[in-house]
């Protein structure tokens, strides 16, 4: 995964930043906000179906936009003023705000329109996460128009997609795997063969990126075998198998997961390390991130579904236990998951697949819902309802003040979170972060 700008990832003190994280700058493995929990509350989410109105059609028709803004403004106001958190359909409200703030002139903008900055084209990672977020709202028009914009990233030489149309050399396996998921979902939504063909082409390309000792190379023509590229490739394969019934896809996915457990699992806490060198598997980067575990859980429960392999289910349960260990690498000192939203949303996705495919994961439901409610309550901007910050440490004073009603700690003000570095202006939001938030809120509504 990659992008532009600087985000700060809170890592456990024993870990270094994973090698494949392009959006994170960590100069020292320190925790920025140290807090002590003084209270918590768990709320259950309500199961909902996706609203049927098309946000894409609304934002490409000014006449419809005014009506939709009016109808949703009441919902936004109600959800932000209520004393009891009710995630419910909030994923739809957040998607509305994403269209409102990042869509204009027929294209997606990586910059928040509230800040009036110059246009910046989103990288492929962002577009893939955004595509899946739009899928969650059931908005066929939105998926189609977004995939149409993504076609400018297409690389005819590989039949995969570039990190950016402005860079004709960077092709990342993990970004392409996520995009394959979007094409697969688009095919299911529309029946259009072109979407299935693109998904097949992407998976075929990714299969050419297998290292000599297994695993999936993270970036074309490089040596790094990333955990995330390996497990996202496996997940793309099992999702594609669900349509094509090509058994070779299950073999490929199984090989990927076997590589992970053999070469990149920490024997102590059972989580996965970040990656290794394709020519020397002993060179292991020992960073750990939530999205690797989330994609692994999804892949394993699908493999169990399709093959009836008990070992796959047992391994998924092992990872679920490791991911929810409050003393583990994914937790801060307050019992909250410590990863940025753009990583942790795939852990929520993994549990969503697990809850749906096996009753054995029900023991983890309360913990996962608690984590989602933490995001809904404390990472949502109180001055900009339905939009989110990636971490409490990367938020605003008013956001932290609400947080500090239940948690004690310190907060360092950072003017760079505001438009034009001016605290009197809006806090700028990130497209990738809020596309991730849409997915988290959707899973919360359907657990």
Residue ranges and their predicted role:
Residues 292-328:
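Oxyanion-binding "anion nests"
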Residues 15-96, 148, 152, 377, ...:
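Fungal extracellular Ser/Thr-rich, low-complexity intrinsically disordered regions
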Residues 230-233, 237-241, 249-303:
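Active-site cradle of extracellular carbohydrate-active enzymes
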Residues 138, 187-188, 241-245, 304-308, ...:
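Short coil/turn linking the two alpha-helices of tandem helical-hairpin repeats
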């Amino acid at each position: 995964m990659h992008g532009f700008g600087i985000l700060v990832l809170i890592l456990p003190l024993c870990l270094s930043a994973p090698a494949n994280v392009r959006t994170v700058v960590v100069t020292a493995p320190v925790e920025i906000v140290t807090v002590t929990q003084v209270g918590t509350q768990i709320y259950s989410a309500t199961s909902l179906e996706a609203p049927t109105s098309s946000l894409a059609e609304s934002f490409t028709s000014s006449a419809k936009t005014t009506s939709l803004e009016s109808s949703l403004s009441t919902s936004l106001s109600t959800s932000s003023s209520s004393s009891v958190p009710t995630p419910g359909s909030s994923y739809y409200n957040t998607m509305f705000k994403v269209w409102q703030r990042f869509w204009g002139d027929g294209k997606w903008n990586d910059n928040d329109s509230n800040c009036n900055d110059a246009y910046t084209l989103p990288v492929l990672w962002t577009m893939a996460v955004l595509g899946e977020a739009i899928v969650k709202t059931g908005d066929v028009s939105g998926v189609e128009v977004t995939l149409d914009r993504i076609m400018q990233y297409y690389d005819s030489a590989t039949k995969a997609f570039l990190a950016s149309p402005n860079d004709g050399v960077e092709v990342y396996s993990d970004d392409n795997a996520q995009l394959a998921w979007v094409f697969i979902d688009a095919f299911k939504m529309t029946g259009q063969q072109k979407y299935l063909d693109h998904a097949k082409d992407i998976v075929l390309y990714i299969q050419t990126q297998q290292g000599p000792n297994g695993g999936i190379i993270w970036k074309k023509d490089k040596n790094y075998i990333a955990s995330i590229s390996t497990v996202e490739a496996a997940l793309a394969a099992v999702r594609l198998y669900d349509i094509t019934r090509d058994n070779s896809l299950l073999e490929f996915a199984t090989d990927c997961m076997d590589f992970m457990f053999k070469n990149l699992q920490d024997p102590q806490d059972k989580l996965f390390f970040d990656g290794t060198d394709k020519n020397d598997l002993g060179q292991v980067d020992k960073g750990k991130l939530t999205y690797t575990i989330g994609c692994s859980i999804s892949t394993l429960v699908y493999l169990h579904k399709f093959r009836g392999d008990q070992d796959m289910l047992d391994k998924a349960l092992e990872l679920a236990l490791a991911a929810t260990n409050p003393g583990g690498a994914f937790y801060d000192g307050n019992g909250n998951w410590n990863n940025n939203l753009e990583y942790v949303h795939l852990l929520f996705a993994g549990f969503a697949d697990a809850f749906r495919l096996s009753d054995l994961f029900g023991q983890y439901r309360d913990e996962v819902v608690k984590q989602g409610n933490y995001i809904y309550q404390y990472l949502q901007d109180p001055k900009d309802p339905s939009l989110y910050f990636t971490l409490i440490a990367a938020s605003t004073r008013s956001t932290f003040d609400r947080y500090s009603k239940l948690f004690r700690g310190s907060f360092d003000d950072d003017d760079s979170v505001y438009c034009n570095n001016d605290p009197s202006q809006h806090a700028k939001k990130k497209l990738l972060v809020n596309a991730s938030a849409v997915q988290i809120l959707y899973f919360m509504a359907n657990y």
